[in-house]
């Protein structure tokens, strides 16, 4: 990723309690479930798109940041998750085409909702509307974050911390897994990456019963405090106590990823016939102009060939190497 600014997107507990979703009547449990559900979509889609883990991690952080400023009632969680994956893939220099992202999310929705898996046709107006919505949501993401998309993950600190603490090798993978799971929570918008890294190292050490230095306290060497580490462990424990997150319909703009209230196919928004005629006329005019240019170009090439054959006394032009 290209770092353009300092990572300063952090909120207090009071700000999270007064989130835009809460103001729209969405309770804390529903908001937590939708956050986990959206992060699950980002993680699963990243695997299907064969993206590196850094892309999924960045996408999940962008997802949490966006819903700290916007409500789940106004922006569909599935479409925002798709835009986060698309934007994160570009930020982490592993870009994917919009068509690939849309096809993957369409397939995931069919499998999760037990619907017949149908191929997403990329030619009808519905696909054009989906692609337009993907672009529109990406612009919303960038606008709400002031085009500052710098993300610092705890993963890069974990290896250094474990090496400094001289912990056993099995602790590394466990800490890495906990860091991935922490991205499903709001820890990334509450604490700096160093604190989250210390928290997951502490949780992994307790799980494997590995003692860590306490005199002096080991976390002070990494600019962390005990209260922050305890909160990270508490949030992770609460996450593991929750059932698998399922989609909860709260958005006013429709619940499906592939259908929208703004669809071109909606009878409430008919397409003017005059517009269709004008578009067809423009298309026909472009075709005629293109054919004319091709014919004119062919005539010019023929004239050049005739001149060359006359110049070189009837020797066929294809004998010469240009």
Regions found by a protein language model. Give the residues of each.
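C-terminal region detector
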Residues: 3, 10, 188, 203, ...
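Structured all-alpha helical bundle cores of eukaryotic regulatory proteins
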Residues: 29-198, 202-231
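An acidic, Gly/Ser/Thr/Pro-rich helix-cap/linker signature
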Residues: 1-24
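A short, structure-level motif marking secondary-structure boundaries and short turns
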Residues: 26-28, 123, 237, 244
């Amino acid at each position: 990723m290209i770092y353009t600014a300092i990572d300063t997107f952090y909120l207090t507990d009071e700000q999270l309690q007064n989130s835009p979703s809460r103001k729209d009547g969405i309770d804390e449990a529903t908001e937590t479930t939708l956050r986990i559900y959206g992060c699950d979509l980002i993680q699963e889609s990243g695997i299907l798109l064969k993206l590196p883990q850094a892309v999924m991690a960045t996408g999940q952080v962008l997802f949490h940041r966006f819903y700290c400023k916007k409500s789940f009632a106004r922006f569909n969680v599935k479409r925002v998750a798709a835009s986060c994956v698309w934007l994160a893939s570009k930020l982490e220099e592993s870009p994917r085409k919009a068509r690939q992202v849309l096809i993957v999310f369409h397939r995931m929705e069919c499998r999760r909702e037990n619907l017949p898996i149908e191929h997403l046709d990329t030619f009808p107006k519905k696909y054009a509307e989906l692609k337009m919505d993907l672009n529109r949501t990406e612009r919303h993401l960038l606008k709400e974050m002031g085009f500052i998309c710098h993300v610092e993950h705890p993963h890069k600190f974990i290896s250094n911390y474990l090496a400094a603490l001289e912990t056993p090798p099995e602790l590394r993978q466990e800490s890495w897994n906990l860091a991935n799971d922490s991205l499903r929570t709001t820890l990334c918008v509450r604490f700096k990456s160093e604190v989250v890294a210390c928290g997951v190292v502490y949780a992994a050490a307790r799980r494997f019963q590995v003692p860590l230095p306490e005199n002096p306290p080991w976390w002070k060497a990494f600019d962390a405090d005990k209260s922050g580490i305890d909160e990270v462990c508490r949030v992770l424990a609460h996450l593991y106590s929750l059932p698998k997150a399922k989609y909860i319909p709260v958005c006013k703009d429709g619940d499906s990823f592939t259908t929208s209230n703004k669809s071109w196919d909606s009878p409430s928004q008919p397409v003017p016939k005059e517009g269709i005629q004008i578009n067809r006329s423009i298309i026909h005019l472009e075709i005629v102009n293109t054919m004319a240019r091709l014919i004119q170009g062919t005539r010019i090439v023929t004239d050049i060939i005739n001149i060359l054959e006359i110049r070189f006394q009837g020797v066929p032009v294809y004998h010469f190497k240009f």
